[in-house]
Amino acid sequence: MLSPKKVKHRKVQKGRMQGVARRGGVLNFGQFGLQALECGFVTNRQIEAARIAMTRHVKRGGKIWIRIFPDKPFTKKPAEVRMGKGKGAPEGWVAVIKPGRILYEMDGVSYELAAEALRLAAHKLPIKTKIVARS
């Protein structure tokens, strides 16, 4: 699972996701990619599940780049605990995604194989995405 080695603050505020991605919106490594169409949080488990789905479909062919990293901790209170009494304990890590951000890139495979692998990966993610190709 992806997670930061060291963080300055153990707990952070949720923040707001407004506007579109300023960076990371073009294909830098591969020929094909998966681009976000809406904003949201993607957990480290979802990133890993999508990566596994892609690699299993292409059967060790081609190369895959993960363009996002979960650097924001999210907290969760235990089950059946009343409201209040402070913020919960850190539960995991999320990547903040804005529209236009490239999530994954692929190269070394045909368009049909890449499109199907990226479609399988998109089903593992909680946001709407589209498949893009280098023109």
UniProtKB/Swiss-Prot annotation:
GO CC annotations, alphabetized: cytosolic large ribosomal subunit
Organism: Desulfatibacillum aliphaticivorans
One GO term of the biological process aspect: translation
Protein family membership: Belongs to the universal ribosomal protein uL16 family.
Encoding gene, per UniProt annotation: rplP
Pfam (any one): Ribosomal_L16
Subunit structure: Part of the 50S ribosomal subunit.
UniProt-listed HAMAP family: Ribosomal_uL16 (MF_01342)
Keywords, sorted A to Z: Ribonucleoprotein, Ribosomal protein, RNA-binding, rRNA-binding, tRNA-binding
Source species taxonomy: Bacteria, Pseudomonadati, Thermodesulfobacteriota, Desulfobacteria, Desulfobacterales
Protein name: Large ribosomal subunit protein uL16
GO molecular function, one term: rRNA binding
Known role: Binds 23S rRNA and is also seen to make contacts with the A and possibly P site tRNAs.
Domain of life: Bacteria
